[in-house]
Amino acid sequence: MKNRLPRNLINSFAAIYILLLNGCGNFSPANEIPPVKNFNIKQYMGKWYEIARLPHNFEVDVTDAQAVYTLQDDGTVIVENSGMKNHVRTSAHAIARSVTPGSEIGELEVSFFYPFYTMYKIIYLDKDYTLAIVTGNSMDYVWILSRKKVISKNELDMCLKMLEKWGYAIKLLQYPTGEIMNIAQ
């Protein structure tokens, strides 16, 4: 049985999240980083694990963070984010939609608290849809996501180089699983 945060607490987290992401979005260099093209939303669906993130107040002390994306018949996406906090699995649900319906651009709008939406921009996606980098409207938000709970040091280094090139504060990244597998190069 899942333990859930009280609804009003989830709504508070979502409202803060949306306000922060939209606060200075139009002036952010993150808007200059293009989303991936030739994006296949069906292939993106399923479970993703959070490998790294910039710190923010709605995921404080959250570990084992993961997201499950489920495409609906109307083209919207059901989002279920979950993670461990104080040894309890918590979850937050949202709905997402394409910014440009029918396009192959990796850019979605996500609402944890209707009618407010925030940007979910996929700025890197490997060809097998197993490793992704996602941002919002500002340089304060970025996530490295993987289909696997652990990634290789090479994969992490590649992501960090891209983030650094784009101007993200990689020294501030948090690694909520603490699991990074080293492999021979």
Spans of features found by a protein language model:
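Hydrophobic helical h-region of N-terminal Sec-dependent signal peptides
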Residues: 14-18
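A beta-rich soluble binding module of mature secreted/lumenal proteins
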Residues: 5, 10, 20-185
